[in-house]
Amino acid sequence: MASTRLTIALAQVAPAWLDRAATTDKVSTWIDRAADEGADLVCFGEALLPGYPFWVERTDGARFESALQKRLYAHYAEQAVVIERGDLEPL
């Protein structure tokens, strides 16, 4: 039986926080770099696009009527990946 080899690269990359386009460009660069090194598959951490919402822990994120939270979440939602919109097409 023939052996099949799969080379997997694990990328620990910081996002361009809350900037979907810039982070997508960064991911694309890392995919190319890993492929040049022989990777067949490149794995990135969850929440890389658009970045983990760490502010929830630091800004009283559970407050429903907080104007600050509403602004932060609106920007976060605006930068989120939407498959149907084609956000991952460049990758």
Locate the predicted segments by residue.
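Hydrophobic structural segments
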Residues: 1-91
